[in-house]
Every structure is written in C-alpha cells, then in structure tokens.
Amino acid sequence: MKIGVLALQGAVREHIHHIELSGHEGVAIKRIEQLEEIDGLILPGGESTTLRRLMNLYGFKEALQQSTLPMFGTCAGLIVMAKQISGEDGYLDKLDITVQRNSFGRQVDSFESELDVKGIAEDIEGVFIRAPHIEATHGDVDVLSTVGDKIVAVQEGRYLGVSFHPELTDDYRVTQYFIEAIVKPTLTEKV
C-alpha cells in the first residue's frame, strides 16, 4: 500500500520511516494531485494554525473535506480533523470530537507517557509536545486511550486521531495499526 504524509510541516521523514517499517511505501504529499495516488494519508503534528493556513494556501482543505481517504492525524493533525475545536469551528470535520488545543501546557510541559491503546498495545510510548486533548466525543467515535481523565486517542471509522507523536519514537505500531486495521479494509471496499 502507498501511504501519504502531508508534507507542509512536521516530522514528515519520521512518519515515512514508520510507514516503511510497517512494510509499505511512504510518500511526501506536497500537491493535491498526489492524493489520487495514495491509499491513506497521515496529517503530522506541528502548529495547527500554521498547518491550516498552509492547507488553505495549497488547496488541501477543500480536497480533504471532500476526500474519503482514510486519515491519521497526530497532534496538530488531530486538531485539523476535529469537527469542533474548543472555542471555534472545526476545519476538516472528519472526527466527531471537540478538541482543546495545548491542553497539557506549554513547550516546557512536554512529557512522555506509556499508554494502553485499545486494539494496539498496552505499552505504547506517547510523546506529548504542546499536546491537545479530546474534550468530548460524539456519535460513533471510539475512545482508544486516555491520560488520566483526558482522551488522547480516538477512531471513527476510517479516521484515527492521537494527541501524541508516535513518529518520534522507535515504536511504529500505531502507524502499522492505521495501515493494517483502517486503510487495508477500505481497499477491499473499492473492488
């Protein structure tokens, strides 16, 4: 399978490395035309306001709103996938959740935590950098993991979102889950 990583900002190379470790082809997505060539898309972290501006500038907002590609958002990628961002409207409206930006604090408050992520593993290393958390889920959203009482990982159908940065660790199981459990089944739907 060919998995794209939106290459406007964030740890693009690290995400591609995790895709390759999962046994698949990773490609940096810089133009909307490339979306036709991939089976799934990862929206990496970074700064969510900057990410939205760049997505507007290069035409990705409309293309991704209309797309049915499976998507996996990490940190800022989770924020842009949300239907609601606390205090403002959502952006891509893919995950029926309300997200609170920077809810774990500033850069100096960044931390790592071992996570029990439902359906993946009980020992996933989560790297949280100015991370958001999910305040509320709606509809058919499945909560996959929490830190204390804060939701940090969810899935809704073909969309996966996490507050942390799995790509900044050596553990590629979250990316592998996205590809094998979310992207792969959608390919059989196309046949």
Swiss-Prot record:
Annotated pathway: Cofactor biosynthesis; pyridoxal 5'-phosphate biosynthesis
UniProt GO BP: glutamine catabolic process; pyridoxal phosphate biosynthetic process; pyridoxine metabolic process
The reaction(s) this protein catalyses: aldehydo-D-ribose 5-phosphate + D-glyceraldehyde 3-phosphate + L-glutamine = pyridoxal 5'-phosphate + L-glutamate + phosphate + 3 H2O + H(+); L-glutamine + H2O = L-glutamate + NH4(+)
Keyword entries, A-Z: Glutamine amidotransferase, Hydrolase, Lyase, Pyridoxal phosphate
Active site: C75 (nucleophile), H165 (charge relay system), E167 (charge relay system)
Cellular component, GO, one term: glutaminase complex
Protein's UniProt keywords contain Lyase: yes
Molecular-function GO terms, alphabetical: glutaminase activity; pyridoxal 5'-phosphate synthase (glutamine hydrolysing) activity
A matching Pfam family: SNO
EC number annotated for this UniProt entry: 4.3.3.6, 3.5.1.2
Family that this chain belongs to: Belongs to the glutaminase PdxT/SNO family.
Quaternary context: In the presence of PdxS, forms a dodecamer of heterodimers. Only shows activity in the heterodimer.
Protein name: Pyridoxal 5'-phosphate synthase subunit PdxT
Gene name in the database record: pdxT
